[in-house]
Amino acid sequence: MAPLLPIRTLPLILILLALLSPGAADFNISSLSGLLSPALTESLLVALPPCHLTGGNATLMVRRANDSKVVTSSFVVPPCRGRRELVSVVDSGAGFTVTRLSAYQVTNLVPGTKFYISYLVKKGTATESSREIPMSTLPRRNMESIGLGMARTGGMVVITVLLSVAMFLLVLGFIIALALGSRK
């Protein structure tokens, strides 16, 4: 009887099994492209690891571009409730919408800097890692360059003065009413 697999293909099959094993599987993360801006001045919003890693110990690694120092942050991957979307509508009505953001916020970053972000998640004996994605924080803007628009217009000053005078007259009338009421 002939062997089922030739001896030469066995090493190739073992290599393929090692590469495709669950412990070596990579997953993708994103920079929350569904948001108006996932980048803030001193922080970034990063999508959470996939749902099949719920309960695993995640380590978020942040590396500054052109630097070898890696800053890590650890947390437990939160459970998924249905399909995990980056921004999901929780309640909507009466002219407002309540949303829930499923993301991890990386804080204390340098403004206007490019970073490379990746996850390493350990769940049981399996370890999965994400591919490294580039993200940049927003540059800090000069305070004088921010337009205030209607900061102190003439109409606002007039309304404030009128309200102040009306409040003074109201308090004065209340005091006079108390004084005249106690004479009887």
Curated annotation (Swiss-Prot):
Glycosylated position list: N28, N57, N66
Protein name from the UniProt record: Uroplakin-2
Superkingdom of origin: Eukaryota
Keywords of the record: Cell membrane, Cleavage on pair of basic residues, Glycoprotein, Membrane, Signal, Transmembrane, Transmembrane helix
GO cellular component: apical plasma membrane; extracellular exosome; plasma membrane
Membrane topology: Single-pass type I membrane protein
Compartment annotation: Cell membrane
Cytoplasmic compartment spans: 177-184
Native source species: Homo sapiens (Human)
